[in-house]
Curated annotation (Swiss-Prot):
ATP binds at K582. Coiled coil: none annotated. Gene3D superfamilies: 3.10.20.590, HUPs, Isoleucyl-tRNA Synthetase, Domain 1. HAMAP family: Leu_tRNA_synth_B. Belongs to the class-I aminoacyl-tRNA synthetase family. A motif ('HIGH' region) lies at residues 38-49. The keyword Transcription regulation does not apply. It catalyses: tRNA(Leu) + L-leucine + ATP = L-leucyl-tRNA(Leu) + AMP + diphosphate. One of its GO terms (biological process) is leucyl-tRNA aminoacylation. Its EC number is 6.1.1.4. This is Leucine--tRNA ligase. One of its GO terms (molecular function) is aminoacyl-tRNA deacylase activity. It comes from Mycoplasmopsis pulmonis (strain UAB CTIP). It is found in: Cytoplasm.
Length: 807
């Protein structure tokens, strides 16, 4: 009888004691398979976690069996706001319950039979870990990539910290609030550490080309960087001795510019708004300020308001109105655009909405509807008429530069990265200041001091500012004050995949710039497969790629990119098809599933639900079906153990061996392609075949079936191997298939009696009815069933079915 609790507990203990998943160091073939490490929340694992973790585990187990040295680690992204807020509300220090949460997560992960090497475990709150985070920051500072700047930030007084745009939401009343806690957020100028990621924009774009990522994922990164090469052009103001600089990527359409649109934040707004429009513009800007940059850029409906002023088109001297648009960002380009409604979809909709002129300046050979967005030849463009779009771009850019109207430039949407948080629970900066605010880098580790009161202040000072004993120190006779801000949660996750490589079994780390580190990085980098949620598709990957490319540039790592292949698993939804949440009451607890049905059942079910990258609904009956299938597998093996089925030659050998060899080949292909659901389907088909036959030619078939099964259901597989007196999976190799069985000219005949399947037999293709019938009559089971019966009719379907109707 299949007792999952007994079997799973037994094998988890054996694996733990024997360090079965220790990182190999014997092969010249390596495979580094990585999960996006979790934030250890108090609620523990949810059923979404095992989906990605099981996928990487299957690959890790497969590669070990294929003779690879495998690095498959796990760790904890344990700094950050959630733990700190909980600590403040309960009056505790966040470290204590963070460690408790980690212990819970670790126990749950081990209960799933995941083959992590926990000697490689990392924790971002470990001083030995963040000492190296601090080292990277110091190197960034030395190269001018970490700077202090007075900038506008999203300030949340209640949380007492600056928030990234991604951490700010708009509530139902249109007000900015924090994602965590829904507290009010305002714009405030503060001095912050900033990392100059924009210096790496081109390198980050170039690096995408050679990566094995989905195009959609690459596109997300490209769009976030947002590189545009175009032309800056000055439009003189009609009534002021000033000009507005616009940025356009389509200079060839400038004769069709019928109005300008500027950002509500543009510095010229106050000067150019006429008195009769002031109040309306003021109200418009007030609504605009409620949005963050992401919401401004993503707005479907584009709104605007006329300033009352005009600019002069420098190419045709025509007077055109200046509008303010809520879709124009000051942070991109110049904060002003020339609007060409005949050749831009957004401008076309805007012009129709507000009754503005639409002037076509590009045509193609065919009649086209406006807006026409493709290239063609110029019309209504003075001496440039008749030029192709390509020729016009070159000529118009020459004209712009020759007449001092502007220049060709490249702009990026990417902004430099605000890297400070006014909170306690984060990595301290290895920085101090003297009385004149000169910066001093601190050698070695700056450890986060234990504090009872970690509540943030309302004035922007970090809680660390109140720890005077820690705050001040002397160096070389100078009194210095430590930086009291801490790094954001991103800091540790930027480089943790390197920390796994550096981690030693005794808990220490090799230094990032050591010779031993270089040797290890040469072996293990890049990460071969990285699996995690879609929510990290932009920022985490972009920030990690930035730090990695920097470390490459200073000679620390041997590869330009950290992650060769990235896969975003789909979301597991509730039984109602909705995202799981406490408020909907549709959360599934994986620990309860493991207890009731077993870890192997959960693993196989989550892989069988559908393609790894698709969203999938949880189905209670389906997971019970997987449990029944595992019971069926266990019972099948027992039938061979107790003699109900036997290991000996039979007429069905060729069929069994061809399907067995086909199974090995196909599972190998499916696993390499991450098609785990179809791989499991093939295992199910093979089990059905073994149930239909009474004999198989070799124990090797059962042994290797168990080895294949171990990728998906490792506990039951180990148990079955042990019952066959076979070695543990860690001491086995992946089975090979015999290609001669895959090139067979055989076909399977289903032999039926009165429509019921009684045997499945291999025959050479295109045998006659008489030949098939003669062979069928030699099968012992068929002979027995036909005793004292008369065949009154034979139904024959060539290469498929022989059905004997008897009385």
């Amino acid at each position: 009888m299949y007792n999952h609790k007994e079997i799973e507990k037994k094998w988890q203990k054996i694996w733990d004691q024997s360090k079965a998943f220790k990182t190999g160091n014997k092969s010249d073939k390596k495979y580094y398979v990585l999960d996006m490490f979790p934030y250890p929340s108090g609620s523990g694992l949810h059923v979404g976690h095992p989906e990605g973790y099981t996928a990487t585990d299957i690959i890790a187990r497969f590669k070990r069996l294929k003779g690879f040295d495998v690095l498959h680690p796990m760790g904890w992204d344990a700094f950050g706001l959630p733990a700190e807020q909980y600590a403040i509300s309960t009056g505790n220090n966040p470290n204590e319950f963070t460690q408790k949460n980690i212990a819970t997560f670790k126990k749950q992960i081990k209960s799933l039979g995941l083959s992590y090497d926990f000697d490689k475990e990392v924790n971002t709150t470990d001083p030995k870990f963040y000492e190296q985070t601090q080292w990277i920051f110091k190197e960034l500072y030395k190269k001018g990539l970490a700077v202090l700047a007075d900038i506008d930030v999203n300030w949340c007084e209640e949380l007492g910290t600056v928030l990234a745009n991604e951490e700010v939401l708009i509530d139902k009343d249109g007000n900015k609030v924090s994602e965590r806690g829904s507290f009010p957020v305002v714009k405030k100028k503060m001095r912050q550490w900033v990392l100059k990621i924009t210096n790496y924009a081109d390198k980050l774009l170039e690096g995408l080309e050679d990566l094995d990522w989905e195009n959609s994922l690459k596109l997300l990164q490209k769009n976030w960087i947002g590189k545009s090469t175009g032309t800056k052009v000055k439009f003189a103001l009609e009534l002021l001795d000033e000009s507005i600089e616009v940025f356009t990527t389509r200079i060839e359409t400038i004769f069709g510019a019928t109005f300008l649109t500027i950002s509500p934040e543009h510095p010229l707004v106050e000067k150019i708004v006429t008195s009769e429009n002031k109040e309306k513009v003021k109200d418009f800007i007030k609504e605009f300020e409620k949005l963050d940059d992401r919401q401004k850029a993503d707005k479907n409906e584009k709104n605007g308001i006329f300033t009352g002023s005009y600019a002069i088109n420098p190419f045709n001297q025509k007077k055109i109105p200046i509008w303010i648009g809520d879709f124009v960002l000051l942070s991109y380009g110049t904060g002003a655009i020339m609007s060409v409604p005949a050749h831009d979809k957004r401008d076309y909709e805007f012009a129709n909405k507000y009754g503005l002129e639409i002037k076509q300046v590009i045509v193609s050979k065919e009649n086209v509807e406006l807006p026409y967005l493709e290239s063609g030849h110029l019309i209504n463009s003075s001496e440039f008429n008749g030029l192709s779009s390509k020729e016009a771009i070159e000529k118009l850019n020459q004209y712009v530069e020759k007449n001092n109207l502007g220049q060709v430039e490249t702009f990026y949407k990417l902004r430099d990265w605000i890297f400070s948080r006014q909170r306690y629970w984060g990595e301290p900066f290895p920085v101090a200041f003297d009385d004149e605010n000169n910066v001093y880098l601190i050698d070695g580790l700056v450890e986060l001091p234990f504090m009872e009161n970690i509540k943030p202040s309302k004035n922007g000072q970090s809680p660390l500012f109140n720890n005077k004993k820690w705050l001040y120190f002397e160096k070389d006779g100078k009194k210095l004050t430590r930086e009291t801000n801490t790094m954001p949660q991103w800091a540790g996750s930027n480089w943790y995949y390197l920390a796994y490589i550096l981690k030693n079994a005794d808990g220490s780390y090799e230094k990032l710039d050591s010779e031993e580190a270089k040797k290890r990085f040469k072996k293990w980098l890049p990460v071969d497969l990285y699996i995690g949620g879609q929510e990290h598709a932009v920022l985490h990957l972009l920030y990690s790629r930035f730090w990695h490319r920097f470390l490459y540039d200073i000679g620390v790592v041997p590869t330009k990119e950290p992650f060769q292949k990235v896969v975003n698993q789909g979301m597991i939804l509730g039984t109602d098809g909705q995202k799981m949440s406490k408020s909907r009451g549709n959360i599934i607890n994986p620990s309860e599933i493991v207890d009731e049905l077993g870890a192997d059942t959960l693993r196989v079910y989550e892989m069988f639900m559908g393609p790894l990258t698709d969203d999938k609904d949880w189905q209670v009956e389906s997971i019970k079906g997987i449990r029944k299938w595992l019971e069926r597998v266990y019972r099948l093996f027992e039938m061979f153990f107790d003699g109900q089925k036997t290991i000996e030659k039979s007429n069905e050998d060729h069929l069994i061996l061809s399907q067995y060899n086909k199974l090995i080949k196909e599972i190998e292909n499916e696993v390499e392609l991450l098609k785990f659901n179809t791989a499991i389907s093939k295992l199910m088909v093979f089990v059905n075949l073994l149930y239909k036959v009474e004999k198989i030619p070799s124990w090797e078939i059962l042994k290797n079936f168990a080895l294949i099964l171990s990728l998906f259901a490792p506990h039951i597989a180990e148990e079955l191997l042990e019952k066959m007196n076979q070695k543990q999976v860690k001491d086995q190799i992946w089975p090979t298939y015999d290609p001669t069985y895959l090139e067979s000219n055989l076909t399977k005949y289903v032999i039926q009696i009165n429509g019921k399947v009684r045997a499945i037999v291999d025959f050479e293709l295109d045998k006659t009815q008489e030949e098939v019938l003669a062979k069928a009559m030699q099968i012992e089971k068929i002979k027995t069933l036909l005793e004292n019966k008369n065949i009154i009719k034979v139904i024959f379907v060539a290469n498929k079915v022989l059905n004997l109707i008897v009385k």
